[in-house]
Amino acid sequence: MFYDLHVHSCLSPCAENEMTPNNICNMALIKELDLIALTDHNSVRQIPAFAEAAKAAGIRALYGCELQTAEEVHVLGLFASPEEALSLQPWIDERMPDVPNRKDFFGDQLICGPMDRVTGEEPRLLLVSLAASLEETVGRIHEAGGRAVLAHVLDRENSVTNQLGFIPPGLPYDGLEIKASEEKQRVLDTHPWIKEDSTVWLVDSDAHRLVEISERENSMSEETFRRLWGDAL
């Protein structure tokens, strides 16, 4: 199963406005992916339009967001249904600081409706930390029925290793995201408590432009998919 589970839409200010739900799903089809997920910064408000676009395109989808914790660690919350993902929004809203977005500096935060028609904008800046710890964020994702994946774990910005220095043992995450398969050994070499075979490893694009969506190159077995999702899908 070829996938890309870390893609931003035009709701994320750092993404291009071309990243509309239909464009994302159609590019995933062009690139012959089997599974795609939408993961905007600190918001699931693009999920309804994305769910409609994925259904129209006939592509398998997961629904999510990329949450920034109080420690400035990025965590992907992935959900099997739009309803589960949307249930997280009130929790996010309560913990997100009321900082207005400066479109001239950060970019647009566009919310789409049917056929990618822009129906609104998110007025609060999404590139902020929530008033929630890493542990609380992982726990809330689980409570909503989702899976928590530590994003780009070796990046120099907003990764768990950059912000905390290491991946905490005992943290109940469901998967680790790396940017390339060769990063796996670096994680294992520096974290002896992480076992290769019992960990779900994801290689995603973190796409902010259509061209950045993964090619048909990163795959997971049905067994790995079931290990991540169990009977949820």
Which sequence ranges carry the predicted segments?
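Conserved Rossmann-like nucleotide-binding pocket used by diverse enzymes
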Residues: 37
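Charged catalytic cores and adjacent phosphate/nucleic-acid-binding surfaces used
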Residues: 1-5, 9-33, 44-90, 125, ...
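Active-site gating loops and adjacent loop-to-helix segments of metal-dependent hydrolytic enzymes
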Residues: 80-122, 166, 224
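Alpha-helix-centered segments that form part of catalytic cores
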Residues: 108-143
